[in-house]
Amino acid sequence: MEATASMGLQGLNGVSYDLSQLDNYLSHATTYVNGNQHLQHPSLPNERISGTVDLSEPPAKRLRRSPSCNESNESNGETSSPAAIIDPSTRLQDVNGGLDRVAGGSESADSMTHDSNEDTSNILSGSATSVSLMYEPSQKNSTPPSTVNNVPSSSSITSDSKGLSGNTDYARYRPRSSIPSKLTAAVYAQQCVTAAYACRLNPYSLHKKEQEALQDHLCHLHVTAYLNIRNGILRLWTRNPMVSVTKDEALGCAKDYRWMGLASFAYEWLVRNGYINFGCVEIPPALVAPKKGRRKDGPVIVVIGAGMAGLGCARQLEGLFKQYHDPLTSPRVVVLEGRRRIGGRIYSHPLRSLQSSKLAPGVVPKAEMGAQIIVGFEHGNPLDQIIRGQLALPYHLLRDISTIYDIDGSAVDEVQDAMDERLYIDVLDRSGLYRHNAVIVPTAEGDRRLIDSGRDLTMSDGLTVRQYEEARAAGTVELLFPNKKVRRGVGHKTADIKATIPPVPTDLGPAEEQPAALACQAMGWKLKDGVPPTASLNLDPVAKASMWPTLGAVMDEGVKQYQRMLPLTPKDMRLINWHFANLEYANATNIGKLSLSGWDQDLGNEFEGEHSQVIGGYQQVPYGLWSLPTKLDVRTNKIVSKIAYDSTGSGKRKTVVHCEDGESFVADKVVFTASLGVLKHHSIEFSPPLPDWKRGAIERLGFGVMNKVILVFEEPFWDTERDMFGLLREPKNRDSMVQEDYAANRGRFYLFWNCMKTTGLPVLIALMAGDAAHQAEYTPDGEIIAEVTSQLRNIFKHVAVPDPLETIITRWASDRFTRGSYSYVAAQALPGDYDLMAKPVGNLHFAGEATCGTHPATVHGAYLSGLRAASEIIESVLGPIEIPNPLVPEKGKAIELGTSVATAQKKKEPPCSNGFSAPVSTSAHPTDASAPARSNNSFSGDTALRQAYEQAMWAAIHAELGPPEPRPARTGLNPFLLYQKDYWGKARAQCDETKQATTKDPNAKAARDEIRQALGLMWRQASEEEKRPYIEQTEVNRQTNTEIWDRWKQNTKEWERKSLEIKKRWCAANPFETWQPPAKR
């Protein structure tokens, strides 16, 4: 698990400095056309004061393809994200020029509007961080505040916008248009499978929500075709997450017109559920015909909290409302944040004692007060697409801890460390035998062999997914197929379905198979005299002694029993308890409070890859979500005091959100993303009160705390190539062998992070975990700083360790906006409590890390919960995805003629005389002119003749009207592409010169991607005067395209009308029953 916390400032000096630094980034308020004064939003906090390009500003949009390889510096682990791609014309005002004001007429996201010399009591009431400096900081006044009007009440939620799949004209799309023709089927299939894993989906089986929607509409044999299409759409997204996947592209993943319904559903399901088109990506508005009528207000969605969950939800809603654009409605999303900044428990605090020469010019060094670690980008972490694919933030890959220091300052022997760690893992594994085993319901699976080879199964037996799965669960599948020939030998692999997430093991193997004594010998331990190799641990008495057993009690008992088997020393006890402290850091609480059966209920959902940190501050991520592609409406300093919601969810009553400053907001839907700690402290009144089932989950789950001590030094005195080092702690009785004695102190400065790679300064961050985290809440600053400095001097005796120049101590439990750090599974928690936390109450929805049962206590879990809440809201507004009936047409049946000219142009499945296509049989057909008498109901032997009949009909139509006008191409809508044509030569020359200078090769040439990146930089740095002609040209092109498109649609409509008249006339003169093909000459 990962810490997800953030903090406010405490103390006048800390507040005034924070304001003075952030004021350098601020611009003045702007007034919108409607008269509401609206503050501009800040761009990313690492904005360069000089106005040069920020690292988070992506270069220009490129075609969807494989992302470029990361450039890694193996010596220090620093990695640059792949160059993110975006249309720069829509981004320039977002990043260049410094941090703007945040939203809605309230105070700025990272500043306050009061004079720093004014009374700060109100500001400090909710803050809990101590900041100290060895010098007096300069004071700087900030800009006065501006006012904001209330959000107007909207009319009832509109549902006029149709789903993306509703009434779709599939014939206008091209099958296989998104499948690269140069790739072999197997290679393409492997890319699709990899993409599904990268998006947290099983490439071989349906997600449970997919199955719920499709089970009555989809033939179980067509699951393979659906998965191939869905995985193909995911491939498009993962290849370049800077470009949203369009419906045209998605339907191009179908290999045949017959699968267009599947592709349409897959696309809309992936969009709605946040598997594609999420994050800082531009979503083009849906192309819908203008409507006549009065404009009306769309739904107003108020999101409470501007952390990762709140910003992620708001950003996703903005994108979904664009995707489901209705010209007559204007939905609004407003985010209310109680702090003066955004980011929630992600807070990168500016350091002011030193300036860094290692960071880019103008970038302020920052220390992470809360969330700090990205726990692997691979296997589905959505932060991969945002951090590396969209914002292109540099990050530092972390190395595992290699050195732990003992209480005397000496490094612990690696062999002893390894033996004690294995012993700790053994105790933890044996405690896992009491884990609650979740029941995982399998879902329908496709044919793995066909999916891996990129092939579809086209046959149908008429059984839906529900029918087949129910029979499979009942063991009656064989009764469905009395004649094996019906299935033509094709097996459907569902009996051994693998779940979307790896199943929780029923036991942990070695702990049950091997006696404890024998396991210890295998670790390198020598048993005490008289202990037989068959001796083992008996944890049952402790595990079953209480109705609510805890992990801590059982693990403590395991250590005690090992003391009777092994010659453990006080040093071994310190080492084992260091690992206990590390587990307490992961859970933000003493392990004595964790549920024995459910503490690791997220097991199996871990992401893969090395852990990393964002260089320059993690807070760039929420700032990027907030500001790109367009700024969200965020109102800071809006402390919510009461939420009067509609518990029925009928839509007849509005929700009113009341703030402490007297302002109120009327909304159709509310998303509550404040922490579980806020809910536990009853800081906000709910009217009506939350139901018992919701309050029960709030009470049963735990909300812990983890604190940090941040130390800034003049020079580093530690090994700067190591990312972290550990420190063993001793109990009050130094040589105690009593396990319980170690609990209070084991997490006190147990781990130090070396943050030079991310801050550019000599910075150490000491962690306070378990009981020590609570001790930090009330221990004076001076005592904490003196102790941690003394410990460092004890370790590094060979150098004179100075006093730190700057110190910051976090106190998350005292922060009124969080009341802690992150959630954990407490002893009395029930298996479904995280799901209950996520469940909406009427029109009140919930998001945040404590509502994400698969990834709790993490930044990515908070973000995923925001995507889930956005999906719930869009479904409540629009209803479920529309599924056509039939979802998959019968094999050989073509698309209706009148839907598009494309059908006539294909002429693969020609329509019959009644205007609808006749099924084409795959059986043999006669080819001679003396075919037996036929009727429209006999389709078995006349395929070739029907094709000849249709060809003759279309030849007559084309002879009279000519072929239909081809669909016009839309061109010239990206000003950057026009700019690129003019400046490509200049950029290439500059890149070649740079390449030749760095490689010292006079013939070196820059790669095409390097030239594109340089062009993106040139475009972003270009003046408005240079850009104006290209932007104006795109507007001209847009108008021209509209005129051409309208003319083409009119011409096509007229051609279709005339072709239908000719067709009827020709068919009347040449009835199919008597028509014979002309004799061959």
From Swiss-Prot:
<feature type="DNA-binding region" description="HMG box">
    <location>
        <begin position="969"/>
        <end position="1049"/>
    </location>
</feature>
<dbReference type="GO" id="GO:0050660">
    <property type="term" value="F:flavin adenine dinucleotide binding"/>
</dbReference>
<keyword id="KW-0560">Oxidoreductase</keyword>
<dbReference type="GO" id="GO:0003677">
    <property type="term" value="F:DNA binding"/>
</dbReference>
<dbReference type="InterPro" id="IPR036910">
    <property type="entry name" value="HMG_box_dom_sf"/>
</dbReference>
<dbReference type="InterPro" id="IPR007526">
    <property type="entry name" value="SWIRM"/>
</dbReference>
<dbReference type="InterPro" id="IPR036388">
    <property type="entry name" value="WH-like_DNA-bd_sf"/>
</dbReference>
<feature type="compositionally biased region" description="Polar residues">
    <location>
        <begin position="119"/>
        <end position="132"/>
    </location>
</feature>
<dbReference type="InterPro" id="IPR002937">
    <property type="entry name" value="Amino_oxidase"/>
</dbReference>
<feature type="compositionally biased region" description="Polar residues">
    <location>
        <begin position="914"/>
        <end position="925"/>
    </location>
</feature>
<dbReference type="GO" id="GO:0040029">
    <property type="term" value="P:epigenetic regulation of gene expression"/>
</dbReference>
<comment type="function">
    <text>H3K4 demethylase-like protein. Might not act as a H3K4 demethylase or is not the major H3K4 demethylase since its deletion does not affect whole genome H3K4 methylation.</text>
</comment>
<feature type="compositionally biased region" description="Low complexity">
    <location>
        <begin position="141"/>
        <end position="161"/>
    </location>
</feature>
<dbReference type="InterPro" id="IPR050281">
    <property type="entry name" value="Flavin_monoamine_oxidase"/>
</dbReference>
<feature type="domain" description="SWIRM">
    <location>
        <begin position="192"/>
        <end position="287"/>
    </location>
</feature>
<feature type="region of interest" description="Disordered">
    <location>
        <begin position="902"/>
        <end position="940"/>
    </location>
</feature>
<dbReference type="Pfam" id="PF04433">
    <property type="entry name" value="SWIRM"/>
</dbReference>
<feature type="region of interest" description="Disordered">
    <location>
        <begin position="37"/>
        <end position="173"/>
    </location>
</feature>
<dbReference type="Pfam" id="PF01593">
    <property type="entry name" value="Amino_oxidase"/>
</dbReference>
<dbReference type="GO" id="GO:0003682">
    <property type="term" value="F:chromatin binding"/>
</dbReference>
<feature type="compositionally biased region" description="Low complexity">
    <location>
        <begin position="66"/>
        <end position="81"/>
    </location>
</feature>
<dbReference type="InterPro" id="IPR036188">
    <property type="entry name" value="FAD/NAD-bd_sf"/>
</dbReference>
<keyword id="KW-0539">Nucleus</keyword>
<dbReference type="GO" id="GO:0140682">
    <property type="term" value="F:FAD-dependent H3K4me/H3K4me3 demethylase activity"/>
</dbReference>
<dbReference type="InterPro" id="IPR009071">
    <property type="entry name" value="HMG_box_dom"/>
</dbReference>
<dbReference type="GO" id="GO:0005634">
    <property type="term" value="C:nucleus"/>
</dbReference>
<dbReference type="Pfam" id="PF13450">
    <property type="entry name" value="NAD_binding_8"/>
</dbReference>
<keyword id="KW-0238">DNA-binding</keyword>
<dbReference type="InterPro" id="IPR009057">
    <property type="entry name" value="Homeodomain-like_sf"/>
</dbReference>
<protein>
    <recommendedName>
        <fullName>Histone demethylase-like protein A</fullName>
        <ecNumber>1.14.99.-</ecNumber>
    </recommendedName>
</protein>
<comment type="similarity">
    <text>Belongs to the flavin monoamine oxidase family.</text>
</comment>
